[in-house]
From Swiss-Prot:
EC number: 6.1.1.5
Annotated positions binding Zn(2+): 906, 909, 926, 929
Species in which this protein is naturally found: Xanthomonas axonopodis pv. citri (strain 306)
Lineage: Bacteria, Pseudomonadati, Pseudomonadota, Gammaproteobacteria, Lysobacterales
Family: Belongs to the class-I aminoacyl-tRNA synthetase family. IleS type 1 subfamily.
PROSITE patterns per UniProt: AA_TRNA_LIGASE_I
Name the record gives this protein: Isoleucine--tRNA ligase
Keyword Coiled coil listed: no
Function recorded in the entry: Catalyzes the attachment of isoleucine to tRNA(Ile). As IleRS can inadvertently accommodate and process structurally similar amino acids such as valine, to avoid such errors it has two additional distinct tRNA(Ile)-dependent editing activities. One activity is designated as 'pretransfer' editing and involves the hydrolysis of activated Val-AMP. The other activity is designated 'posttransfer' editing and involves deacylation of mischarged Val-tRNA(Ile).
A Pfam family matched in the record: Anticodon_1
Length: 943
């Protein structure tokens, strides 16, 4: 009867669960971290180390967090945790952006606009309460993601201290000469009722009307003469313009030409029976005339645009308004007519060229900009012949103006076109340029543009194309409009002279005094402040500005308002946000930083892409393809979400679907099972008593420590350059190849069959201990919950949390004098694959059931054979086969052959050995197993 030898084997045993059960375990860990003050402990443990500051870009305090929020916060968390392991103190202070229109709209929906049910102070208080509620909801979800940080003490742009620091930051900007005030055309949202910054604009397709309008020359003969032409009697001359915004024609004050463009004087369509010649850019003449129904291009003269400067035209429907011809660099011959109708109240280039020619001084504000903040023509807007424009919304006015002009002879062509047009990012509605009195941070006044472009060069951009992208944006951007005509925000706390409109000469000092008061009582202090308290006898000459600061200024000055307050250095080491922030937070922070300190507020800038479904489509409720992070955490756990984020190429769009989540759950199981196998085989191992020195290890064990050392160097370098996908791939490969299909498989024999305290067994356990110690650290930044769980099961004494440790220092490369080098092992592993290929058909045809039933012969050249023959006795353990013979042959190749063994099988180790039955006490065991049970035990050197 077969004796049961199971009790003599040392099979794996661990209480580390096979199933992660993350949705249940993770919340329990979070509760413990909260209870124990984990973040405070982490900071205390890292005290005195070099600082690494990842400064948090504040999400807006409105609505539940979505997948994009999760991507952003988890990427930041991975970096922060990797920095602790790398020996840094890496404080993370989360923040929230709390002012602005979305919160105002939420309060307006409930209480109406300011003055309906609530006065301004009450309205601001409701906004403050709403934002605070939203922060609490978002904070709960961010913490559930496993993100560590100072959640009990975040920065909020609504805090009195922050609001005060923001006003102090404005004082610095003023002090350095960057603030300016003027009536300039700015992006204006009629739904917001306010100016918009560049970052608040997104482009979408819009169908617009296109019209060609003729501006008749006041002195047709003079225009013809500039072309060297003699004008026949009864022939008129006009300059046609092409525009997609007919609603701006009432504000048209000039027509701009290109100084060096070539223009032709051509025969155009008749004007109510009167012949008419037109001035058109030569490159566009044929196309324009075709639009007007003129088939043949008849040219009467050529001239440069410069020859027509200062000549006068008539406005197409305001006969008393003379329209000068100006020269502008913005005019091109790409489309239209080469002549641009110029409305300085509704276009940046129009404004600049009109200012250059002194045109603005000749007109009143209502003529420059006849449109109010709701998009309606002012009461003073003159009619178009019999058509009343006053009170008409500009989007309706387009068709009305076109119809009215059909009767006048100035409408040469009308059509429709779809084109990319600026829209409000909140309302998704078209916006317009509108000249209004605003406060600006000037890009030129104190060299801000040039200084910002220089500062960009001193920042490390991830990906590298980010540098060119933001540089192009800064190079081409207009002045930064920082004023908003809204209620909920930080006031532009300036006093301006009632007559001149100039800021008080002591503005920076006064701003700081106001800031001190705001720090005690919040922004309401500004609105209740009696000017005489600060200005004394001057108070009657000055008035307070009631505009508030752009929310991009709020978030853009966090480097000034937060970091010094928390004892953290400037510039921050890293800013990390979505790729849309090149025109948003990265840029507002850059401009404010350069305006205040002549330097970027960050050393490195990293961007991530947006989340899309598996087909590359944007996730949305209407498509039904959205995946919420809360749902992932409830069903799979935060660690699965974190693994997906780490494994994705976040520099591009990040695809997610249920199938992708399933693949990540499978990858997680592979990592968890590897950890569990390591722990199972470390049962009964105490590193203080049983650890075998590296130079005394069995060579295979020493090799796996060497491989782990190589991998750790790769992983640490990848964390440092934020390449998390490489880390995940390398980890999975290590678990599958180096450990799973090789090392863990080969060492089972030693671990299970040797005596418990045998040197060969303790050697394998020591190697696994080193690998486990390193492994738990490798995964900790990504799989934070699982790493914490695993940390609690490692043998030996440890600090309380894996993040209190640093990268494992127990690994080392193979020494130069090792009996087997890394290259030797590589060759042996190739040989192992060769053996497996030879055995495959034998298994398939039933010649053997398992590799242990085959005896192997390896024939190699004399030098290789001599190198491998000392290993032959143990090669069977590497191949997990029967006995192995190595022979020398006159060949450069290596030949492997195999034959079924005829030897008996040992019931304990399952190896087929001639020694089975040689000991009468154990007739079914091989001599090796007998020795391992009763004798001194076997010795291993190689495998």
């Amino acid at each position: 009867m077969t004796q049961d030898y199971k009790a003599t084997l040392h099979l794996p045993a661990t209480e580390f669960p096979m199933r992660g059960d993350l949705p249940k375990r993770e919340p329990a860990m979070l509760e413990r971290w909260e209870r124990e003050g984990f973040y405070a402990q982490l900071r205390a443990n890292a005290a005195g180390r070099p600082l690494f500051v990842l400064h948090d870009g504040p999400p807006y305090a409105n609505g539940q967090i979505h997948l994009g929020h999760a991507v952003n916060k988890i990427l930041k968390d991975i970096i922060v945790k990797s920095k602790y392991l790398a020996g840094f103190d890496a404080p993370y202070i989360p923040g929230w952006d709390c002012h602005g229109l979305p919160i105002e709209i939420a309060i307006e929906k409930k209480y109406g606009k300011v003055g309906v049910k609530l006065d301004a102070a009450e309205f601001r208080q409701k906004c403050r309460e709403y934002a605070t509620e939203q922060i609490d909801l978002q904070r709960r979800d961010f913490k559930r993601l496993g993100v560590i940080g100072d959640w009990d003490n975040p920065y909020k742009t609504l805090d009195f201290r922050f609001e005060a620091n923001e006003i102090r930051a404005l004082a610095k900007v003023v002090d350095n000469g960057h603030l300016t005030r003027g009536v300039k055309p700015v992006h204006w949202c009629f739904d917001c009722g306010s100016a918009l910054a560049e970052a608040e604009i997104e482009y979408a397709d819009k169908v617009s009307p296109t019209v060609d309008i003729a501006y008749p020359a006041r002195d047709p003969a003079a225009v013809a003469a500039a072309f060297g032409a003699s004008l026949p009697a009864g022939v008129g001359v006009a300059v046609p313009i092409w525009t997609t915004t007919p609603w701006t024609l009432p504000a048209s004050l000039a027509v701009s030409l290109g100084a060096e463009l070539d223009y032709v004087l051509v025969e155009g369509p008749a004007d109510r029976g009167q012949p008419r010649w037109l001035v058109i850019a030569e490159a566009l003449a044929a196309k324009a005339l075709a639009r007007y129904g003129v088939g043949e291009v008849v040219v009467h003269g050529h001239a440069k645009g410069a020859a027509l400067e200062h000549m006068l035209l008539n406005h197409p429907f305001y006969a008393e308004r003379e329209i000068p011809l100006l020269l502008g660099d913005h005019v091109s011959a790409e489309d239209g007519t080469g002549a641009v109708h110029t409305a300085p109240g509704h276009g940046q280039e129009d404004y600049q060229v009109s200012k250059q020619y002194g045109l603005l001084e000749r007109y009143g504000a209502a003529q420059i900009n006849p449109v109010d903040g709701r998009g309606v023509y002012l009461p003073s807007t003159p009619p178009l012949r019999d058509t009343v424009l006053a009170g008409l919304h500009i989007w309706k006015a387009n068709d009305v103006i076109i119809e009215a002009l059909r009767e006048t002879g100035v409408l040469l062509a009308a059509s429709k076109m779809e084109h990319s047009y600026p829209h409000c990012w909140r309302h998704k509605t078209p916006i317009a340029f509108r000249a209004t009195p605003q406060w600006f941070i000037s890009m030129e006044q104190a060299n801000l543009r040039a200084d910002a472009l220089k500062a960009i060069e001193n920042v490390h951009w991830y990906p590298s194309w980010g540098q060119a992208r933001i540089a192009g944006m800064v190079d081409g951007r207009p002045d930064w409009t920082i004023s908003r005509q809204r209620t909920w925000g930080v006031p532009i706390a300036l006093f301006v002279h009632r007559e001149t409109g100039e800021p008080h000469p002591r503005s920076t000092e006064l701003l700081r005094q106001v800031a001190d008061r705001v720090e005690q009582g919040g922004v309401d202090v500004w609105y209740t402040l009696d000017a005489s308290e600060l200005l004394s006898s001057e108070a009657a000459d000055y008035e307070k500005i009631t505009d508030i600061l752009d929310v991009w200024f709020d978030s853009g000055v966090t480097h000034e308002a937060v970091l010094p307050d928390r004892g953290l250095p400037k510039p921050a080491d890293l800013y990390l946000e979505g790729s849309d922030q090149h025109r948003g937070w990265f840029q507002s922070s850059l401009l404010s930083g350069v305006a205040m300190d002549k330097a970027a507020p960050y050393k490195q800038c990293l961007t991530h892409g947006f989340t899309v479904d598996e087909h590359g489509r944007k996730m949305s409720k209407s498509l039904g393809n959205g995946i919420e992070p809360q749902d992932i955490m409830k069903t799979l756990g935060a660690d699965i979400l974190r693994l997906w984020i780490a494994s994705a190429d976040y520099s591009n769009e990040m695809s997610l679907s249920q199938e992708i989540l399933k693949r990540n759950a499978d990858a997680y199981r592979r990592l968890r099972n590897t950890a569990r196998f390591l722990l199972g085989n470390l049962h009964g191992f105490d590193p203080l008593q049983h650890l075998v020195a590296l130079d005394e290890m069995v060579l295979l064990d020493r090799w796996i420590v060497h491989r782990a050392h190589e991998l750790q160097e790769k992983i640490v370098a990848a964390y440092a350059r934020y390449d998390f996908a490489e880390i995940v791939q390398a980890l999975l490969n290590f678990c599958s190849v180096d450990l799973g299909s090789l090392y863990l498989d080969v060492t089972k024999d030693r671990l299970y069959t040797m005596a418990e305290d045998a040197r060969g067994r303790r050697s394998a356990q020591s190697a696994m201990y080193h690998v486990a110690e390193a492994f738990v650290r490798w995964i900790a930044p990504v799989l934070s919950f699982t790493a914490e769980e695993l940390w609690g099961y490692l043998p030996g004494k440890h600090v309380d949390n894996v993040l209190f440790a640093t990268w494992y220092d127990g690994l080392a490369p193979l020494p130069a004098d090792a009996a087997l080098s890394g290259a030797d092992f590589d060759k042996l592993l190739v040989l192992r694959e060769q053996v497996a290929k030879v055995l495959e058909p034998m298994r398939a045809n039933g010649a053997i059931g398992a590799a242990l039933e085959a005896e192997i012969t390896v024939a190699a050249d004399a030098q290789t054979a001599a190198r491998w023959q000392p290993l032959a006795e143990e090669l069977r353990f590497l191949f997990i086969s029967g006995d192995v013979t190595v022979t020398a042959a006159s060949t450069d190749d290596i030949f492997v052959s195999a034959q079924p063994t005829t030897k008996a099988k040992c019931v304990r180790c399952w190896h087929h050995q001639a020694s089975v039955g040689s000991d009468p006490r154990h007739p079914e065991l091989c001599s090796r197993c007998v020795s391992n049970i009763e004798g001194p035990g076997e010795r291993r050197r190689w495998f």
